Design a protein with these regions (language model features):
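PLP-dependent amino-acid enzyme catalytic core
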Residues: 1-494
Length: 494
């Protein structure tokens, strides 16, 4: 039986996996979400010796069950290849009291590569499957990492255009240059005068604009998304949680069946939601620890059941988590409400019109899986320094948020369960923050800090940032948030 993906806002809006990948977002504003979970044979005595590609085949074939085995092999083998700098793809590193799952070994040194390396293959395969003649326009808002990873994946892919919006003053210099120097005739990068929430809200509006959709269709164009709102982004992230567990079994750190906690630095809620889905297919998960920075709207939600975006937006040293409207939480809300699309739509409407909602009647067992805490800027910097002093290992600021939150959780609960930290970016993506935290040196440029980071860590400067300082800047457009749609129409000649 083919797995059904339903809009979180309309029970009658159902599609297959390949259709969901092509559409990106549901036309009613909801997110396509599984209403049942596939059966996956998680026999870790066998899986522990499997390659990353083999684990990917096991998980993806269950969730994307309208793709053939041959189609999935094509997608997997083209995605997880020499673009990654280690055959392990996502190695697990043992530190003092925790395990860091390194998700930054792809071409843009951030965890988004794990899914965005395969999404273009999913999308072009799905387009062929459905005889799609329209050009696919990938429309994406980024808080720093998705934009570059999406462009790296889709650059010069036939039948696609990609347009990325980012907050002009809301990303690191390295992140910005990674985007603005991107090559590819089909890539377009636009800075906005506003924050990530402004960018994401306007992208959603464009997806839901009926008149714009009709204009696109008349020109043989169709929007899709590379954000984690697209199920094709989310499902590949389930793979690395299963793979991490298999590595723990293989190394003898745990016995198959032992529960493991995962601590995930969280902004748009996609990464931790993938861990939740891993639990639903049988991964022995104890707690999912949701780690936030000073934009702690999710921490408050899990503690009070009230989601309130009416608060100051703070620019932090972990910019990929500087988000007040966490889009993927909608999928968890849908599950918490027993997959009730009417109730979910009501709450999302309340968030849009009143800036908040309260969760009242919900599945307590699901919520019980989650713990939540946040780390301040000072705590994040202190954690980078502590981990370096303890393990001679440098974490990026997002990973350090998760690491600091895990230590808070452990102190509060005494929970001794083995815990994996999702290490979501290389410190080379945020060199100034890392070097300042470790050495106390201030006032360095990003490129001075890159050299210092190499000296301190002994880790080679990754190709993703090596030479970035002298790379030609190709994308120089900045627009007001209100002018985003006009910019899209101009690029597409509408």
């Amino acid at each position: 039986m083919t797995l059904v993906y339903q809009s979180t806002r309309d029970a009658n809006n159902t599609v297959t996996a390949s259709q969901a990948i092509l559409q990106g977002l549901a036309t009613d504003g909801g997110l396509f979400t599984p209403v049942t979970y596939p059966k996956v044979d998680l026999d870790f005595d066998k899986i522990k010796d499997a390659s990353y590609q083999e684990v990917a085949k096991l998980v993806l074939s269950a969730f994307l069950d309208d793709f053939t085995a041959e189609e999935l092999d094509y997608c997997i083998n083209n995605a997880y290849d020499s673009k990654f700098d280690t055959p392990a793809i996502a190695p697990l590193v043992k530190l003092d009291g925790q395990y860091n799952l390194e998700l930054f070994h792809g071409s843009t040194i951030a965890f988004k590569d794990m899914a965005l390396s395969i999404l273009p293959y999913f999308m072009t395969t799905a387009a062929k499957k459905h005889g799609l003649e329209s050009k696919i326009v990938i429309l994406t808002a980024t808080s720093g990492d998705t934009g570059k990873a999406a462009m790296a994946g889709f650059a010069d892919v036939p039948g696609t255009e990609i347009i990325v919006f980012y907050p002009k003053d809301g990303v690191s210099k390295v992140q910005e240059l990674q985007m603005t120097t991107q090559t590819g005739d089909n890539t377009h990068v636009i800075a906005i005068d506003g924050n990530f929430d402004d960018a994401q809200t306007n992208v959603k509006h464009m997806f839901n604009d009926v008149a714009l959709r009709e204009k696109l269709a008349a020109n043989k164009l169709q929007f899709s998304s590379a954000n984690s709102m697209n199920i094709g982004r989310l499902v590949p992230q389930i793979v690395y949680y299963v793979y991490a567990y298999a590595q723990l079994v293989k190394s003898g750190e745990i016995v198959a069946g032992d529960k493991v906690n995962f601590t995930v630095p969280t902004g748009n809620f996609g990464n931790i939601l993938a861990a939740f889905y891993a639990k639903q297919i049988g991964l022995p998960v104890g707690k999912l620890i949701c780690a936030s920075n000073d934009n702690n709207v999710l921490t408050d939600f899990f503690k009070t059941r009230v989601y309130d975006k009416k608060r100051e937006f703070k620019v932090t040293t972990s910019p990929s988590m500087d988000i007040l409207v966490s889009s993927n939480l909608e999928r968890l809300i849908f599950h918490l409400l027993g997959n009730d699309a009417v109730k979910t739509a009501e709450l999302m409407n309340a968030l849009s019109t009143q800036g908040q909602y309260e969760l009242i009647d919900f599945d307590a067992a699901i919520l019980e899986l989650f713990a939540a805490e946040y780390a301040t800027e000072e705590e994040t910097a202190a954690e980078i320094k502590r981990v370096y002093q303890t393990d001679a290992y440098i974490e990026d600021p997002h990973t350090a948020v998760a690491s600091a939150v895990y230590r808070k959780y452990q102190a509060a609960t005494g929970d001794a369960t083995k815990t994996v930290i999702a290490s979501t970016a290389s410190p080379y993506k945020f060199p100034v923050v890392a070097v300042e935290a470790v050495t106390g040196k201030v006032g360095l440029t990003d490129f001075e800090a890159l050299a210092q980071l190499h000296d301190i860590s002994g880790v080679a400067v990754p190709p993703a940032v090596d030479g970035l300082e002298t790379a030609p800047v190709r994308h120089k457009t900045t627009v007001a948030a209100a002018d985003m749609q006009a910019a899209v129409e101009a690029y597409l000649g509408l």
